[in-house]
Amino acid sequence: TKTLRNLILSGVFFGITMYSYALSYFLIPIFLICISLYLLYTKEISFRRVLLWAACVCITALPVILFVCSLLFHWETIHFLGLTISPIASERMSDVGVTSFWENIKDIIKITLTCGSYRLDAVPKFYTLYPLSIPFIVLGFIGAVYSFLVSLCKRTFQADSIYLLFFLSGLITIGLSGSGYVYRANSFFICYLFFLIKGLFLCCHFLSSYHTGFMLLLS
């Protein structure tokens, strides 16, 4: 946020990311709104720069935005810069809703941390992630929430908040759209890795007097 060049580049790259897969055009806007509000609150960015950032994202992702608008408003086929944008998947918008929001969130957390009904996603008892890592992921998540709340109280930026807000944005996206597939929640795993590392760090810090033995046990 301090360098104009980096701000513009990040906006362009976020815009490009919205082309990657179907849920990106839900996830990325939700995350950018959350992180923008957080950066504004902690005074890490000015409102003018937020508008510039948003403009870079929107210009880069304009075909995707037009596609989403064609789904929402049932527009006719659009010809834009040599692209043909047609609402060919308009019926999928009916999947978006809030009626099963909490159920969808509970299901995707279970599937990504353990296993679901699809045998190709994860083997029962071995899980998607190693069972030993799950308590540390939970601990790291709690630690990230605590850091986020402290940063709100002190109005200071905490890097943990980026991963936490990205994870929460993913939960909101899945909650609204619903999915029983692990690949629809790929964004979770970078957050799980961060929470795992943070959880291990918190345990090592708490058990500092037993640091060597604790690390040998984990090994």
Where are these regions (language model features)?
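Transmembrane alpha-helix segments characteristic
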Residues: 14, 54, 58, 132-176, ...
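Specific aromatic-rich, kink-prone transmembrane helix
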Residues: 1, 6, 10-14, 32, ...
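Signature aromatic-anchored transmembrane alpha helix within multi-pass, membrane-resident enzymes
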Residues: 33, 58, 194, 200-219
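Structural signal for the C-terminal ends of transmembrane alpha-helices
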Residues: 1, 33-45, 144-153, 200-208
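Membrane-interface alpha helices of multi-pass inner-membrane proteins
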Residues: 7-22, 171-172
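Transmembrane-lumen/periplasm boundary regions of multi-pass, lipid-linked membrane glycan transferases
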Residues: 16, 28-145
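Membrane-interfacial loop-to-transmembrane alpha-helix junctions, especially the N-terminal start
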Residues: 3-6, 50, 152-166, 212-216
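Hydrophobic/aromatic-rich transmembrane helices and adjacent perimembrane loops
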Residues: 26, 160-207
